[in-house]
Amino acid sequence: MSRFFIDRPIFAWVLAIVAMLAGALSLAKMPISQYPNIAAPAVSIQVSYPGASAQTVQDTVVQVIEQQLSGLDGFRYMSAESASDGSMTIIVTFEQGTDPDIAQVQVQNKLQLATPRLPEEVQRQGLRVVKYQMNFFLVMSLVDRSGKLDNFDLGNLIASQLQDPISRIPGVGDFQLFGSPYAMRIWLDPGKLNSYQLTPTDVASAIREQNVQVSSGQLGGLPTRSGVQLNATVLGKTRMTTPSQFDEILVKVNPDGSQVRVKDVGRAELGADSFAISAQYKDSPTASLALRLSTGGNLLETVDAVKKLMEQQKAYLPDGVEVIYPYDTTPVVEASIESVVHTIFEAVVLVFLVMYLFLQSFRATLIPTLAVPVVLLATFALLPYFGLNINVLTMYAMVLAIGLLVDDAIVVVENVERLMHDEGLSPLEATRKSMDQISGALVGIGMVLSAVFVPMAFFGGSAGIIYQQFAITIVVCMGLSILVALVFTPALCVTILKAPEGNSHHERKGFFGWFNRIFDRGTRRFERGVGAMLKGRGRYLLAFLLITGGTGYLFTQIPKAFLPNEDQGLMMIEVRTPANASAERTEGVLQEVRDYLANDEGALVEHFMTVNGFNFAGRGQNSGLVLITFKDWKERHGAGQDVFSIAQRANQHFAKIKDASVMAFVPPAILEMGNAMGFNLYLQDNLGLGHEALMAARNQFLQLASQNPKLQAVRPNGKDDEPQFQVNIDDEKARALQVSIASINETMSAAWGSMYVNDFIDRGRVKRVYVQGEDISRISPEDFDKWYVRNSLGQMVPFSAFATGEWVNGSPKLERYGGISSLNILGEPAPGYSTGDAMIAIAEIMQQLPAGIGLSYTGLSYEEIQTGDQAPLLYALTVLIVFLCLAALYESWSVPVSVIMVVPLGILGAVLATLWRDLTADVYFQVGLMTTVGLSAKNAILIVEFAKELYEKEGYPIVKAAIEAAKLRLRPILMTSLAFTFGVLPMAIASGAGAGSQHSIATGVVGGMITATVLAVFFVPLFYVVVVKLFEGLMKRKPNAVKEVTHEV
């Protein structure tokens, strides 16, 4: 094949240009994201039960739904939480590879079976099933600079004009409105109700009867008599639109003809649908829409679509209202991709300089350099066929591939130049002879290097997705690299290279002459060193065994983790005031946080928004959340300006706040996989010990964790039990007073909860009508005496006649995991420790908890455990596949052994470099380690292959063959190794977005390449001699053993 293109170089150029054009076109169309869909697909079920307690929601809604969620294909785990505001969320997580649309349909079908058993009020509110992602990817806020609109006005703007079109954008999965649409609020006065012998149920019934939309039909509608000349629509009663209309609703007509209207027992007001959540952008009231990405959604395209829509909608917003994005995850995506693109260009330049140093010819150096854009662009053309897009993982893989793909071109160029120098051939003749010699070796080395990464592509879970991005990209690059080396590079050699004027590199003068003389002296010393090692084989084999054992020990000392921490330019602060604290107290703490961010960190903070009434631990008046976006990484390059340092300073400052818990935390490296970095677990009541026992175990866990030096920021992701007022209905007294239990329950729900009645029309949009007691009538337990229920005789009976109250402890939020009562706990490893160390510490703590209390990890921690279980298999499988490929390549079982023995030498450097930089053994480290294994084997192949040829075909003594092979291959080994090392060096010293993952990959690779090169060139000849002698000795003994057995018989 190569000869065809050697004779037709323009044909080769045409193919290369077509490949690059195809790649460029594909590149323009490929979606861009920070990561592929690594997070497992999930579906959430959201339900509201107004006025119900957390326990009521759990007993009547959560467990009913959970019982039906069985038999789901690809089911992984399920979590549920119910809150004291009547809200409930169940999140069903599926295995990687499950189609999220099919998963959603399955959950909806199961939910249909549970719906008839749910309370009527829940069914009237509706059940929402959506594809779910844990973290927000964008928060869009409205701020009124004129000061005319408050939070609820802005919230209604979002709910009425923006929420629906935004939620329909492809990629938007779920949303959280930090604000509220308008609703018609009917505030009831219990004293006036009693004076007219009315109850809240009477008012609600009157509203249902009179606030209706009547379909009245037509005049002259078909069928009709012949001769009818008129057809017209009949308009009947329509739904009401204003508070004054609701005030005039007739509730009761007395026997004397007098009338009681809504305005006589209360008042109608255009208020908020919910008063639970309010937000501020810096010091301005705001309402916000926080968006979650749908499973499989493209982040950049979705955010771009949202912002384009908002640009269109700005013209329809009131004067003075601005659109702001206080929390946006796309800058880190763009910055990460931009950073990797810069790294690729830097890698190409560094590789070019290294090649130029060794090849010492601009023409010769240009040939491998030209191979880089051809291979990379052609790779972009093929990636979509494997389901891959442009993301930081595929880009990282291309950085690794640059050093690998130039290797093949270097081998071709170096061999052509050698033939021109040594045999005086023309470029055409040298290229033809060179390709005849090395075509098989190119394919063989490419096969071995590809074999290193192929096993990674078959692993499952989130780690498997990461492995696949690297494996497929690198294997595609390697395959294309071999094709380019066989097709394009020979054509370039013929057209670009010139026959040398002298006979040797060493005749050069200046810098290159000095370098060659130094290199020659080093080569002679190296040759003597190899000879000395081969004479003292026993000592150096013992040293190798010690190195291998030390490497194994050091490997166990690397802290384990799933992913490295990343500076995403984002931070969150969670605020918790004491149980039963009011929203006003929480707002005071949030104001302290706002002052700190504006004054102490103002130079680094771009946006911040506070939310009162909500955080990731749950809703409630004692909950608060702060979303913070920092300035660009280029403006935060100084010491202490990364998000981790900022979070540490913030926590030190907030620790001074005595009447609240304020915790700053950083999002995880992959935003879709959680809200905070660290570990995520559930304590489970496996034996049904009860809520109090579970809370006691949680408190014991938190106390032990606070004393453990490996753990920090360990906190419950829920709410502490709080005093709650329990109303006890005496059924006997109620029956004696002829009061129905249903009337009691309806009155309680309407008075202290919020009874949804029906809908009204507000400026062309349908909104809700609620009935509730005035705030002054539901402040303290004594206010129960203000409310009455009408008995069957028409008499008004006070609550005190049949009900008593008492204060009890109860939970404002209840959690379940896997259908078992559970409590969620979050935390982080202390500085100097990894999440793997933290999990070991947690296992020790669990041994001290009562029997029946179990532990389950979720989210990122679940993935980390799965990855840890896979890692040993990955390492073993990789080495085995490499060994088998080598055996097939050399048709020998002995030669591969001498190659595989070099692997620990590469791993040693990777381990030492990782420990030196205090990094972790995460997924990226494992990818780098596999790369090191492949490159170590490649270096060994270059020596072993040459030694085998000298020994078996040219009759060299084995020791001399090994020494000669090591000497002759030293220059190309150093050139290719240095080219690869300098190619990944920009990743090892990267800063800014994505620096953590780049460090994790490149540090191990750089360290591994240093030891794999420095030690391997000495040890590989030793391995080859020892292994060949050992196998030859075994083969000689086998015939003798057969003869002895035959003689005895």
Curated annotation (Swiss-Prot):
Q: Where does this chain mainly localize?
A: membrane
* Domain of life assignment: Bacteria
What induces or represses expression of this protein, per its UniProt record? Constitutively expressed; the ttgGHI operon is further induced about 4-fold by toluene and styrene but not by antibiotics.
Query: Where does this one sit in the cell?
Result: Cell inner membrane
Keyword annotations for this protein, in alphabetical order, are: Cell inner membrane, Cell membrane, Membrane, Plasmid, Transmembrane, Transmembrane helix, Transport
Report membrane topology: Multi-pass membrane protein
Instruction: State the disulfide connectivity.
Output: none
A cellular component annotation (GO) from this entry? plasma membrane
Entry-linked Gene3D superfamilies: Multidrug efflux transporter AcrB pore domain (3.30.70.1440), Multidrug efflux transporter AcrB pore domain like (3.30.70.1320), Multidrug efflux transporter AcrB TolC docking domain, DN and DC subdomains (3.30.2090.10), Multidrug efflux transporter AcrB transmembrane domain (1.20.1640.10)
Spell out the InterPro entries in the cross-references. Answer: AcrB_DN_DC_subdom, Acrflvin-R, MdtF-like
Which residue stretches, if any, does this entry annotate as coiled coil? none
One Gene Ontology MF term:
xenobiotic transmembrane transporter activity
Where is the chain membrane-spanning?
10-30, 339-359, 366-386, 392-412, 440-460, 470-490, 542-562, 871-891, 895-915, 927-947, 973-993, 1008-1028
Known function: The inner membrane transporter component of an organic solvent efflux pump. Involved in export of a number of organic solvents, including toluene and styrene. This is the most important solvent efflux pump in this strain, although it can export AMP and some antibiotics.
Q: Which family does it belong to?
A: Belongs to the resistance-nodulation-cell division (RND) (TC 2.A.6) family.
- Put simply, this protein is called Toluene efflux pump membrane transporter TtgH
Q: From which lineage does this chain's organism come?
A: Bacteria, Pseudomonadati, Pseudomonadota, Gammaproteobacteria, Pseudomonadales
This protein's encoding gene = ttgH
